Structure formats: structure tokens, C-alpha cells
Amino acid sequence: ITQTLDACHVLIPYREQILRDARQVRKSPALRLLVCLLEQWVRIGGNLNDSSYTPPEGIDFLHLFPAIPTMPETVAYLRQRNVPESVIIATMQEYDASVQMRLLATGKPCFTVDRLNWLQRLIHNRYLHIGRFNFDLPAKHPLGVRVYKSCDGEIALLADDVQIRETDEAFIGRPCVNGLVQEKTVTLPKACWRQRLGPDDRLVNIHIPRAGAFDKQTVLQSFQQAREVFAACYPDEPFEAFRCCSW
């Protein structure tokens, strides 16, 4: 355990608590079996938020142990992709962030089953921390709107949850302004407007960590850095835009 955590640059402040809980698990055949089963469940992408699973009490880092064997695999995969070492270290620090989140919520460091479930995106190599943000790798995500751009650079959003009509001459629908669907209907002539984003486009979903600067320069630098990393390291993962539904 110590060798893996050191090599992956994770959870250094919590080492003693982790080793203490590991000793407890080793003493219990039932807990050892549970950790093995959870590791296999995580590897196949199983849902750990299922209400039929009741986590054992009294072992704060139990749900970290199924993830530890996957950590070197994650680092090796990112290096194979030529992801910058600074991004790899920052990405692996999501384990520390998960413990810190529970520390703020409960008053003690721990790694709960919900955090293991969340980190499946990292375990399955679909997650990066770049600059200020966490980024899921490209996928199709529900937008709720379709995005249109005019020949003058103007952007318009039409709500996708109500009918959008497309004729030979125009796109017709209800505009979405500041997140609110308007009652009026607008017409966007095709001579000047084209659809820029729709339900079949691949997007990069963004998550906003609680700590860190949030000024415009920091945000734009993070987007630019993310574009560079995706272009250089994930040329087989094209995307059309960034999308954020984070808290």
C-alpha cells in the first residue's frame, strides 16, 4: 500500500489512518473478501450507490482499498497517452480531494463508498484534472438546448425539450435566455444561421473543485490548457465544446 501511494503521489497526510484500517481488514476474512468483490465490481463499472449495499461501519478507509490496485494502472495509462506529468499528479490528487471533502462534511478523514463510485471515472480513464477544473473525457451529454451561430458571430439557444421545427429556410423554436425558456417563438433564417451544437455532438463535461481561484484569466487559461492536452494526448477523442453542470 505504502509503495503504491508513494509512487502515485496520493494521500500522504492520511498514511497512518490508511495503514491502521488495512491491518483491520487483514484480520477479517469477510472484509478481505468484500474488498476483493468491490474491486471487481468497480473494474466492471458497477453502481456502488445501489441501496441494497450497506457499507460496514468503523473502517474509515475501507472503500479506498478496492481502488489502490488500479492506481498504478491509471498512472501508466496516462503516461502512455503522453499526458504531462503535472496533469497526472493533479489528476491523482482527486483521491486526496475526496478525503478532504468528507473531512469537511463529517469532521474526520475518510473515504466513503460514494467517493469510490465517483472515482470510477478516473479508474476507467475518463477523467483529468487540468488547470482549475476537472474534465470528463468527451461523450454525448444532454444539453437541453440546441446552439446556433449566426454569420455575424451571434449565439442563440433554442430549447430542445419543446418542439424545434426545421424548414428549408429556417430553424424555428423557443429561445432559452439565461437558462429560462421563453414563451415566444423565434425564427432563425438558414441564410445566416447554422446549428453549432446538438444532441449528437460530443462534449467535455466540466466539474468545478471547491478550492481555487475563479477569475476570468484562470478560467480561460484552464480551457486553453485543456484544449492543448486533449489535442496532443487524445486525438482520437474529438469534441465540439465544453459543458458545465457542476455545483
Stretches with model-predicted labels:
Residues I1-Q217, A232-W247:
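Non-catalytic substrate-recognition and accessory regions of acyl/acetyltransferase enzymes
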Residues D215-A226:
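Glycine-rich acyl-CoA binding loop
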Residues Q225-C233:
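A generic secondary-structure signal
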